[in-house]
Amino acid sequence: KIDPPPVKSGRTILVYMAADNNLVNSAWQNVDQMLVGMESIDGNLIVYIDPQGGTPQLLKIESGGKKTVVEEYAKENSASTSVLSRVIARTKALYPAESYGLVLWSHGLGWAPAGVIPKSYSADDLWRKDPNAPLTKWFAQDGANYIDISDLAGALPRDREFDFLLFDACFMGSVEALYELRNAAKYIIASPTEILSSGFSYDAILPELFADTPRFEEVCRLFVDYYRQSSSTWPYASVGLIKTDELDALAAAAKAFYASASPASADVSQVQYLERMQTHVFHDLLDYYSKIGGDAALYAAFAGQLRKTVVYEDHTEYVFSAYSGPGVGPFNMCVKLNTFCGLSTYVPRDLSALQLLQESYKETPWAKAVGIAY
């Protein structure tokens, strides 16, 4: 007997949930939202979930609130590029489609290499979390294992095969991370700040992602409005929509302006930061470039190219941060966004607390493309 080939669908979306961590309850809550969101949608929503204390599964969420276990796996490391690559390939084989989307769901820390995180505790507790803070996300964590951005880029298609890549994870709207991932998808939806563990409202956004022409701006608006209109203690969110085929031009414009500027003389304390770390790692990209001097025409060209790259952004007045540095707002756990362009950047500087990050940053494709060497 020969099985017939799978029937090609209009769109297949894979949600890859690396939930072998403290976000497992939020993962299942999001799956419940997906069941609601797919109530009357004709398309393939495939969920790989590796839950803490459970068995990794490949699920199909269908209209009518139906959830089917397609495959189960032995215990495995979902924060492994080999597992991620296998799941992507398996999903495309089982559910071929005219177009594909990918949601990466877990913890996240932008471009910062996983190996730096534990070591940085010896450097002024750079990554120390506030013990009273609610959960936020990264990408990706399975127990003590993580995926570096360079490895993630290698595990994803290099021909923008995905129509979109959505990060339901903290800090992934970093220009360094997204530049390295620019060939994975046509559009990337990501937040340059922290995302609360409740994440995106999948019941609301799935109809937009499965539309004949996906409505990415509406997905972003719905995400921020979900928190903006929330009555919870933490009604905060930010997001950017990035057109990836503009990122090379952004790097070129950044290089031209950066060469004319004096970044070492910038007063970093005056640059919009996006978290409450003891020493800030994520700053607003445009605000930083506005404070390093340089040729006015080249700056205008950079700012114009940035508007072509970040085609939509939205944010609440404040954003939440789980870190333990000074803050404002409820319980002093927030950061006020006086300016926001939709992308973050690392600001290179000679500080002992940043030594390991500084060394790693010089090796990022963004730093090399822009000519950031110090």
Q: Where are each of the predicted segments found?
A:
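N-terminal extension/subdomain marker
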Residues: 1-98
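Terminal, contiguous helix-loop blocks that mediate binding/assembly
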Residues: 6, 118, 125-374
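Structural recognition of the beta-strand scaffold that forms the well-ordered cores
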Residues: 12-17, 44-49, 100-104, 163-167, ...
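Gly/Ser/Thr-rich loops at beta-strand to alpha-helix junctions
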Residues: 20-23, 106-112, 170-174
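Short, solvent-exposed loop/turn and secondary-structure capping segments
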Residues: 26-27, 57-58, 112-117, 177-178, ...
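Surface-exposed loop and adjacent secondary-structure segments within mature catalytic domains
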Residues: 48-72, 99, 103-143
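Hydrophobic, aliphatic-enriched repeat segments that assemble into extended interaction scaffolds
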Residues: 88, 92, 96-104, 110, ...
